Amino acid sequence: MSQMTKRALVASLKDLLAEKPLDKITVTDLTEHCGVNRMTFYYHFKDIYDLVEWACIESATHALAGQKTYDTWQQGFLQILQAVQKDKVFVTKVYHSISREHIENYLYRLTYDLMIGVVEEKAAGMTVRPEDKEFIANFYKYAFVGLTLEWVRTGMKDDPAALIERVSTLIHGDITKALEACRIDK
C-alpha cells in the first residue's frame, strides 16, 4: 500500500507539472489532486523535493536492475536515458526548477554505485588500493553525469543508444587499463 501511495503522489506530481512549474506546486495541490491528506504525504516525504528524488531513484533502480556489471553497464545506462527521455516533460521541468547541484548530487550517487560495482568486478584478483578504485569510479561518474546533464540541457535530441555506443567506444578496456596501472601487487 505504501509504494502504491508513493507512486500515486508521483503521478499527481507529473500531472501538475504539465500545468505549472515545480516551485509553484504545493503539498496541498498534490494531496488534493491525489485524493490523500497532507499527513499521508508527510508520512512518506519531508517535502516535494524529497518526492522528486524518490521518483528519480525509483525509476533509476528499475532501469538498473541486473545491469551493474562490466558486460551490462551499457544496457543499464541506456535504460536510464530511455526512462529519462520517456519522462521528458517531468525531467525537463524538474531540471529547470531545482538547483543543478541537487540534480548532480542525485546523479553522482546513482552513477557512482554503478561504476564502483564495475570497477570492483574488473579488479577481482588484483591488489588495488581502495582509494585508487574510488578515483577510477569517480572519474567515470563525472564523465557520465556531465554527458547526461548536457544531453538533458540540450533537449535530449541525441539518440540514447547512439550516445551510449559512443561512450562505450571511448572507454572500451580503459577501466581494466586504469586498474592495471594502479596495481600494487606487480
Model-derived segments and spans:
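An amphipathic alpha-helix adjacent to DNA-recognition modules
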Residues: 3-6, 10-14, 18, 23-27, ...
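Conserved acidic
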Residues: 1, 5, 99, 103, ...
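Amphipathic alpha-helical segments used for helix-helix packing
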Residues: 55-56, 83-108, 117-122, 149
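Amphipathic alpha-helical segments that line or abut small-molecule/effector binding pockets
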Residues: 74-89, 138, 146, 161
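Amphipathic alpha-helical packing segments from all-alpha helical-bundle domains
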Residues: 100-125, 131-146, 169, 176
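Secondary-structure edge/capping motif, primarily at the C-terminal ends of alpha-helices
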Residues: 67, 91-95, 122-125, 151-155, ...
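C-terminal peripheral helix-coil segments that are non-catalytic and often amphipathic
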Residues: 150-186
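N-terminal non-catalytic regions of secreted/periplasmic and cell-surface proteins
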Residues: 69-76, 185
